Every structure is written in structure tokens, then in C-alpha cells.
């Protein structure tokens, strides 16, 4: 423990600094309710309940808080957000009991009904005792703190996947191992994987957790071969307690990488370490994989996430309105939800554009405005849009070459045009992050960063909003 710092003084100073940054009394009021503590090089910020902790779901609040603390206290390397264990136990137990009751009324063929669907999450005797004490140095987890079970909207289309994910986080290696989640792009698979990591880390602070995309795993494997560090690569992945691999389908036909993953899988599974895998297809339909690999995927629980039904889509929009502190009538939310039936990302993107247009035009959010935005977005459009076409159109708009947007130039006008093209590809296509990263010649994390940056600029900079608006219309009406 860092004995030179008083956690209470650290937190009081941080909140005072943030008072000049945020005008909302709600944000500061919520932060003042938290209790700080220091563990190693981490400042632990504990909220009394999940409602108060939700203030940290706002990326602006989270980033500002982290920057304020880390800039003021160099000995603190990270902040961790937690909820009072007693309250969290009560909240989750009630939620899971309700879900288990609803599950018992239906027939889930994929579950072994000789075992309980969801174990007693808070039975201390069932928890797995992993090696490594609290002072163990953990590798970078790759887990995004913004994605939690608390802000995952539940509906009939995803309740089984969510319940199984919670169970895997609560009893790593003992409940549904491996857990294989599949579904179309944009339905919430990645959100669940990050939620597993965040919840497990809260329950088991010493746990070694790793989230990777299949692209990350492939790059690590290739780099280990080229640098002669294969042994370190094996040690890195085979000492993990929970390994989550996103978009496994992109390992198809990569025989050497598959062989490495096969042995990693066996090593972890034989040691009762938890594996969670996501894909756009069920194991049986994964082409380019050996039968032995597909059979490994099927030896635990395989569950899918369907496209969200209308009620769930409305609930997602309501949650987004709550997070953005916007009031939108149920009539408008229902209309928006009825226009987007497949991707949660498209659904939320449409709502954010309505917010932005209303803000810039200084008008109320009404049905006329919503209809205009959705018409311009080409809601329920049937034909697919090619990312290459988006790159070419964006480059032409900024009087650049398409190769500039896929190149390495950091010149300001090229950089912003590139990020706008990435944002449009993410918003207007169903192409996965790894594939977009490949198209732009970058890691998928760059696509995520660009999307967030442009999303933020849309609400603040009229020119960015205008450019996005014009480009979107041109692309959809091409």
C-alpha cells in the first residue's frame, strides 16, 4: 500500500478540481458520495450503489477524473471503480433470481438441466482460488471499463447470453467453460466480453484477465515468431485465468495461428481456466477451422444473441437518453426503434444524430426532426455499402487521394479526413473492427479511437457535423 498518500485527501482534492470542470451538480454530488482507498499503485473509488457509480459510465467524467488524479499524484498509476460489495451482492442476486425464474419456464436445449442454470453467485465456497496474491503484477487486461453488466440492456434476445456471462465471471473455469457467444455484428457480443472482465476483476482482484480480438492474438503470435520469443508468448497466454477472444472467425484459414490457439485453449481448459469466445457464426458453421477446434468450442455452452426485439430496442434508446440527459417522447423512440431492427450500434447512432441536429438548430426533438434524420440516414436501406467506396468518397470530398486515408501521414487535414472515413465506415456498414483495421492498415483500436473522437466532435463542432451530414447523404444516395 502507498503509505505516503492519504486516499481521503487525494479524493477531496480531485473532486474540488473537477468542480471547475463540470457544471452539473449531479456529477459532483455523485462523486462526493464515493469512498476512496489505495491498493498498491491504484486508487480504488467505491460508490454506495450502482446508480451512483453510473456517473463513471460517462467517458468524459471517467477520463477527467483519471487525468486529474494521475496528473496530481504520479505514484498512482490507475483508478478502479467499484461498488460496495454488500449492495452489489443484493442488487445482482435479486436480478439473477428473477432471470433464473424466467428461464425455468422455458426450454433451453443448450443447457445441461442436471446442473443449476445459475449458481449461487455469492457462495464464497464456490469461488475458485487462483494463484498470485494481491501484489502480483497483472498484464494489461485489454478490458474496457465502460462496458459493464449494469449498462447492458437485457431483453429476450440476449438474456441467456448475459446470464451465462455473469455465471462465467462469478465462477471462472467451473461454469460454462468454454462460453461461446455468437450473433450478428452490433448485437452486444463485445459488450458482454468486456463486462465479464470488469465483473470478474471486481470479484477477484488478483485474477489475471485478458481480452483480445482475434487480430490481437494473431499479431502477438506473428511478432513472437519474428522476434524469437515464442516461449514468452506461450507463457503470456497460458498463465491467464480468464481469456476472452473476440471475433474468432477471423482465425479461419490461418493454420499456424489456429495451431497455437488450439494448444493455448487446451492448456487453459485443462487447468480449469475460463475461456470466453465470440463469433458471428456458431461453431458448426465456422469454415476454415479443423474439426478438433470446432469440437473444443462446443464442449461448453454455446449461446446466441438474436437481433433485439422492438421492446429491447426501445429500452436501449431509453438508456441512451438517460445517459445523455435528454428527454424524448415514447412515440419518437418507438418510431426510431421500428426503423432499425438489426444493429444496436446503428440504433444508438441514429439517436445521437438526432440529438446533434436538434442542438445545432436549437430546436426541440420532435417527430418531424426524427423523420428527417432517419430519412437522410436511409433507415432500413436494403443495399450494402462498401467501406472502400466510403474511403473514396471521403477522400474526394477533402480533395485527397484514397491512398492518403489508408497511409501513414499525420498531417492534420489528412488525419481528420481519415478519422471521419473510419467513423462513417463504422456507422454505415456492418464490417467488423478487425476487417476495418485491415482496410485502413491499422489496428482495430485505432478505429475505436477515431469513432469516439468524431462522435465527440459532432456534438461540439459545426463544421464536423456538417461534413458528416453531407458525406452521409452523398454515400446513401450514390
Swiss-Prot record:
What NCBIfam families does this protein's entry cite? DnaA (TIGR00362)
What's the protein here called? Chromosomal replication initiator protein DnaA
What is recorded about the protein's domains? Domain I is involved in oligomerization and binding regulators, domain II is flexibile and of varying length in different bacteria, domain III forms the AAA+ region, while domain IV binds dsDNA.
Q: What is the lineage of its organism?
A: Bacteria, Bacillati, Actinomycetota, Actinomycetes, Micrococcales
State if DNA-binding is listed as a keyword.
Answer: yes
Q: Write out the function statement from the record.
A: Plays an essential role in the initiation and regulation of chromosomal replication. ATP-DnaA binds to the origin of replication (oriC) to initiate formation of the DNA replication initiation complex once per cell cycle. Binds the DnaA box (a 9 base pair repeat at the origin) and separates the double-stranded (ds)DNA. Forms a right-handed helical filament on oriC DNA; dsDNA binds to the exterior of the filament while single-stranded (ss)DNA is stabiized in the filament's interior.
Q: Which UniProt keywords apply?
A: ATP-binding, Cytoplasm, DNA replication, DNA-binding, Lipid-binding, Nucleotide-binding
Q: Which GO terms describe its molecular function?
A: ATP binding; ATP hydrolysis activity; DNA replication origin binding; lipid binding
Q: Which GO terms describe its biological process?
A: DNA replication initiation; regulation of DNA replication
Q: What is its main location?
A: cytoplasm
Q: Does the keyword ATP-binding apply?
A: yes
**Annotated region described as Domain II, given as residue ranges:** 96-141
Query: Family per UniProt?
Result: Belongs to the DnaA family.
The UniProt record gives the binding positions of ATP as 186, 188-190
- Region annotated Domain I, interacts with DnaA modulators sits at 1-95
Q: Where is this region: Domain IV, binds dsDNA?
A: 359-478
Q: From which residue to which does the signal peptide run?
A: none
Cite the record's note on assembly. Oligomerizes as a right-handed, spiral filament on DNA at oriC.
| Annotated spans, Domain III, AAA+ region | 142-358
* A GO cellular component annotation in the UniProt record: cytoplasm
Record's subcellular location: Cytoplasm
Tell me which InterPro entries the record gives. Answer: AAA+_ATPase, Chromosome_initiator_DnaA, Chromosome_initiator_DnaA-like, Chromosome_initiator_DnaA_CS, DnaA_C, DnaA_dom, P-loop_NTPase, Trp_repressor/repl_initiator
Amino acid at each position: 500500500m502507498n503509505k505516503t498518500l492519504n486516499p481521503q485527501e487525494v479524493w477531496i482534492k480531485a473532486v474540488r478540481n473537477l468542480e471547475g470542470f463540470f457544471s452539473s451538480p449531479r456529477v459532483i454530488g455523485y462523486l462526493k458520495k464515493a469512498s476512496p482507498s489505495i491498493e498498491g499503485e491504484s486508487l480504488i473509488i467505491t460508490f454506495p450503489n450502482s446508480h451512483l457509480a453510473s456517473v463513471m459510465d460517462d467517458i468524459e467524467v471517467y477520463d477527467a477524473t483519471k487525468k486529474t488524479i494521475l496528473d496530481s499524484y504520479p505514484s498512482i498509476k490507475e483508478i478502479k471503480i467499484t461498488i460496495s460489495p454488500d449492495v452489489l451482492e443484493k442488487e445482482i442476486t435479486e436480478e439473477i433470481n428473477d432471470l433464473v425464474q424466467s428461464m425455468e419456464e422455458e426450454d433451453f436445449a443448450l443447457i445441461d438441466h442436471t446442473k443449476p442454470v445459475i449458481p449461487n453467485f455469492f457462495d464464497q465456497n464456490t469461488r475458485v482460488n487462483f494463484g498470485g496474491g494481491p501484489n502480483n503484477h497483472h498484464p494489461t487486461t485489454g478490458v474496457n471499463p465502460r462496458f459493464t453488466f449494469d449498462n447492458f440492456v437485457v431483453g429476450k434476445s440476449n438474456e441467456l447470453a448475459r446470464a451465462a456471462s455473469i455465471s462465467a465471471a462469478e465462477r471462472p473455469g467451473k461454469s460454462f467453460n468454454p462460453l461461446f457467444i455468437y450473433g450478428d455484428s452490433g448485437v452486444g457480443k463485445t459488450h458482454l466480453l468486456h463486462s465479464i472482465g470488469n465483473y470478474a476483476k471486481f470479484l477477484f482482484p488478483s485474477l489475471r484477465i485478458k481480452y483480445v480480438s482475434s487480430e490481437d492474438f494473431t499479431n502477438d503470435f506473428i511478432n513472437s515468431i519474428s522476434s524469437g520469443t515464442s516461449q514468452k508468448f506461450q507463457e503470456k497466454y497460458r498463465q491467464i485465468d480468464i481469456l476472452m477472444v473476440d471475433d474468432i472467425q477471423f482465425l479461419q484459414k490461418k493454420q499456424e495461428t489456429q495451431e497455437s490457439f488450439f494448444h493455448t485453449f487446451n492448456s487453459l481448459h485443462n487447468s480449469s481456466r475460463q475461456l470466453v469466445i465470440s463469433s458471428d457464426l456458431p461453431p458448426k458453421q465456422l469454415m476454415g477451422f479443423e474439426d478438433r477446434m470446432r469440437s473444443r468450442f462446443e464442449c461448453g455452452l454455446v449461446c446466441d444473441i438474436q437481433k433485439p426485439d422492438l421492446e429491447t430496442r426501445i429500452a436501449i434508446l431509453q438508456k441512451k437518453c438517460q445517459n445523455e440527459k435528454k428527454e424524448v417522447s415514447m412515440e419518437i423512440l418507438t418510431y426510431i426503434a421500428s426503423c432499425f431492427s438489426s444493429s444496436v450500434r446503428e440504433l444508438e447512432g441514429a439517436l445521437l444524430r438526432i440529438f446533434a441536429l436538434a442542438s445545432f438548430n436549437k430546436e426541440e426533438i420532435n417527430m418531424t426532426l426524427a423523420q428527417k434524420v432517419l430519412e437522410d440516414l436511409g433507415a432500413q436501406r436494403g443495399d450494402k455499402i462498401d467501406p472502400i467506396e466510403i474511403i473514396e468518397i471521403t477522400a474526394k470530398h477533402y480533395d485527397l487521394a484514397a491512398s492518403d486515408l489508408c497511409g501513414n501521414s499525420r498531417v492534420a487535414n489528412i488525419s481528420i479526413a481519415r478519422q471521419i472515413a473510419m467513423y462513417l465506415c463504422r456507422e454505415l456498414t456492418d464490417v467488423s473492427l478487425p476487417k476495418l483495421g485491415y482496410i485502413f492498415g491499422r489496428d482495430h483500436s485505432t478505429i475505436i479511437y477515431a469513432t469516439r473522437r468524431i462522435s465527440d466532435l459532432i456534438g461540439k463542432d459545426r463544421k464536423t457535423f456538417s461534413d458528416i451530414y453531407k458525406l452521409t447523404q452523398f454515400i446513401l444516395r450514390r
